[in-house]
From Swiss-Prot:
One of its GO terms (molecular function) is NADH:ubiquinone reductase (non-electrogenic) activity. InterPro entries: NADH_UbQ_OxRdtase-like_20kDa, NADH_UQ_OxRdtase_20Kd_su. Residues 1-11 have a biased composition (Polar residues). It is an enzyme of class 7 (translocase). Keywords: 4Fe-4S, Cell inner membrane, Cell membrane, Iron, Iron-sulfur, Membrane, Metal-binding, NAD, Quinone, Translocase, Transport, Ubiquinone. One of its GO terms (biological process) is aerobic respiration. This is NADH-quinone oxidoreductase subunit B. Its EC number is 7.1.1.-. It holds the Pfam family Oxidored_q6. Its cofactor is [4Fe-4S] cluster.
Length: 193
């Protein structure tokens, strides 16, 4: 949140939302029912919020990922899970089953023979599901781009949300991709997806 300065007074910007054209105020800001409930519950330690904001907050802090390591990028993905980087501090924990995971990290060269397996695993993931494409080979074929047996990017098989470039990308780059995915989830919410 950015603070605006008006001479010597610092004020926060008005909250964003749907504005009533008649009054110029946010819709629901003058609703006595919600004002009374908020006043009654605020001193008891309760927070009144929308369900979408609560779901989005919980989802960004508890992303369960499943690795789909196909080549050398998978080693950097494993390094990201080690204590030096510790991606679990961001709520990004590994899962072995696609039915328990929210994020699939495709790391490495995707061949034509492996593409149906990738799609099958992706279809087993529950909604909302996200895909991080890690490395040049997963992004666009990489070094093997002109080979007859390589898919030129995993986005031809599954929809990709975040691309992490590099050959192989560093663990820091993957962590940055994870943080970008969390930012994307916060921005889009769960209902819009």
């Amino acid at each position: 949140m950015e603070l605006r300065s008006n001479n010597s007074t610092i004020t926060a910007p008005k909250p964003k939302g749907i504005i009533d054209p008649n009054t110029g105020e946010l819709i629901g800001s003058d609703d006595r029912f919600f004002r009374d409930i908020n006043a009654e519950l605020s001193d008891k330690g309760f927070l009144v919020t929308s369900a979408d904001a609560l779901i989005t907050w919980a989802r960004t802090g508890s992303l369960m990922w499943m690795s789909f390591g196909l080549a050398c990028c998978a080693i950097e993905m494993m390094q990201c899970s080690m204590p030096h980087y510790d991606n679990e501090r961001f709520g990004y924990a590994p899962r072995a089953s696609p039915r328990q995971s929210d994020v699939m990290v495709v790391a490495g060269t995707l061949t034509n023979k492996m593409a149906p397996a990738l799609r099958k695993v992706y279809d087993q993931m529950p909604e909302p599901r996200y895909v991080i494409s890690m490395g040049s080979c997963a992004n666009g074929g990489g070094y093997y781009h002109y080979s007859y047996s390589v898919v030129r990017g995993c986005d031809r098989i599954v929809p990709v949300d975040i691309y992490v470039p590099g050959c192989p990308p560093t663990a820091e780059a993957l962590l940055y991709g994870i943080l970008l995915l969390q930012k994307k989830i916060r921005r889009t919410g769960s209902i819009e997806r």
